[in-house]
Amino acid sequence: MKVFKFGGASVKNSDSIRNIVEIIRSYGTNELIVVVSAMDKTTNALENVLELYLKNNQEYLKKIDQIFIFHDKICRDLFPKNHNVFSGLKNIITKLVSFLKNNKSPNYSFVYDQTVSYGELISTFIINSYFIEEKLKTNFIDARNCIKTDDYYRAANLNWELTQKNIKQQVENDSLIITQGFIGSNSNNFTTTLGREGSDYSAAIFAYALNATSVTIWKDVPGVLNGDPRVFQNTQLLNQISYREAIELAFYGASVIHPKTLQPLQRKEIPLYVKSFENPIKPGTAVSKGKTIEPNIPCYIVKKNQVLLRLSSIDFSFIVEENISYIFSMLHEYQMPVELIQNSAISFSVCVNNKYKRLEELVLVLRSKFNVEV
């Protein structure tokens, strides 16, 4: 069993979806799991929908219409008129609108997961329909029936035991499987998400549960580069790299691989390949046990939009272990990933990522115990 993951850029239009079919045919359609992200920038578009919705701005409905039009155009390029994919797409969009109109929850993270997950639900529905149109025998699996998590919305933690059991029960080893990345569900069957760009992690979860022979992430770059080509000039391809080096690069911001992807693969020594969907015959980058970085060159990472918090004691007392423990517990509660820390006798500085936009809440709580500068 192999696992392929196709990200948003690799399913951004009808030509990209046709390309996926060609890639799959070239590798063989048996014993293959295809994990798919939302198409192009759909996740961003759904985040914009949510932002307007939470402001009671009815313009959110127009944004949903734009999402529908984008996907409808792709379908018109791929399918004949009167194909049932068109009514199916409308039904999915109707469910999204219905959820938002009937939602009573004030929990932003809960509403986020129920809303943004529609990107993956739409993309897999369209792509599976196209596979069938192209006479590929597929087995469609809703990832929410397999990947079970806790209630930590937007960055849910996996229930490994139950997830493995579900995957083994639902996946037929000799078939072509298509499923969603990024999403799962909790014990109450509410949709959860695994963190932004979490489809890589989904692929690793399926690979781990099924003892896959490999995972391939298909990207719009030739593999893992030694720097972001949007920031640095003359970047070079890393032909091979170890799990350890890859996870360090991913943790500190190399966006080509999701940070959580490597751990489950490393446990079972499942190799990871990062390849270009635009040039699939090229070898890309191989990530596996014991590989030394090749070529042996420096790697560069730039992380934008970071926030530096400086905390100091109100009464000039020392910042001790108890204080630091409290600070970290609050960072966890308010979903603030930590990038760097520095402490001294009476101060503590921490660089955090405000990707969940809860900085104001966090600062308000911390100011009850510390002087806080942002």
Task: Label each PLM-derived region with a short phrase.
Residues L136, I270, M336:
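Short phosphate-binding/catalytic loops that engage adenosine nucleotides
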